[in-house]
A protein has these predicted regions:
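Active-site neighborhood for divalent-cation/phosphate handling
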Residues: 1-22
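A short, polar/charged loop-to-alpha-helix boundary motif
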Residues: 55-70
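Adenylate-forming
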Residues: 11-18, 40-42, 61-63
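Short glycine-aspartate micro-motif
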Residues: 4, 29-33, 39-41
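Active-site glycine-centered loops adjacent to acidic/histidine catalytic or metal-binding residues
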Residues: 8, 35, 211
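ATP-binding/phosphotransfer module of carbohydrate and carboxylate kinases, centering on a glycine-rich
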Residues: 15-30, 66-225
Length: 225
């Protein structure tokens, strides 16, 4: 019996290229999975793109910001400072939340801090959805940072869709709207006009659906045609 193995971000991207009826609706998709870490999946021409060594799509380790005023700084441990994962993964939102808790003493985040509880990304999302202004601002900054990465993806692949999944998708439009706005501000004129930037549609089921679709794609090579 044939067995096919791939990583979770790749199969999630494959699922997101398909609708709820599992029909292929987007042939070129870039997916960001934003949670404890930042992963990425690429679907090009209706099939997972893996690259020369099978490791394509490590979008979390692309560099968003680096001090290049002088010599290029020596690399540090992964995630590298300035990488997408360093500034967008859950621990980055944890840092923003801790700062907000200190700066805004009347916020829900400050109450967590006053109770001696760690202020985590899940608390930020929950507080933002409940209308806490400082938490909503942290989610907005989070979305803006993701938007820069989305702009890079649009410049590189000119995809039909860029999808944001993982825990970040729980923030909904509070995250998506700033991500979309910044992405479109940072792309060249004309680029992105046909790119849909959206949240993942399949949620926690994306991995399972994508795994099933992977088997179908491998067993039926013309399925994406």
């Amino acid at each position: 019996m044939p067995v096919f193995v791939d990583n979770d971000a790749n199969v999630a991207a494959l699922a997101e290229a398909h609708d709820d009826d599992l029909d292929l609706v987007a042939r070129d998709v870039v997916m960001f999975t934003v949670g404890t870490h930042v992963g990425g999946g690429l679907v090009l021409g209706g099939r997972i793109y893996r690259g020369a060594t099978g490791a394509a799509g490590e979008l979390g380790h692309t560099i968003l910001g680096l001090d290049l005023a002088g010599a290029v700084p020596a690399p540090m441990g992964f995630p590298q400072p300035g990488s997408l994962e360093f500034v967008v993964a859950g621990h980055a939102l944890d840092r923003l939340a801790a700062l907000a808790g200190r700066v805004h003493p009347k916020s829900a985040l400050a109450r967590f801090r006053a109770e001696g509880k760690p202020v985590l990304s899940a608390h930020v999302i929950e507080a933002a959805l409940d209308g806490d202004e400082s938490a909503a601002r942290m989610v907005e900054i989070w979305g803006q940072r993701i938007g820069v990465a989305v702009a890079n993806a649009v410049h590189t692949f000119d995809p039909e869709e860029v999808v944001i999944g993982g825990d970040a998708a729980r923030a909904g439009l509070l995250l998506l709207e700033p991500a979309r706005r910044v992405a479109l501000e940072y792309v060249l004129p004309g680029l992105g006009a046909r790119t849909t930037i959206r949240l993942a549609r399949h949620g926690i089921h994306a991995g399972v659906l994508g795994a099933a679709l992977l088997a179908r794609c491998e067993l039926e090579p013309d399925v994406a045609g």
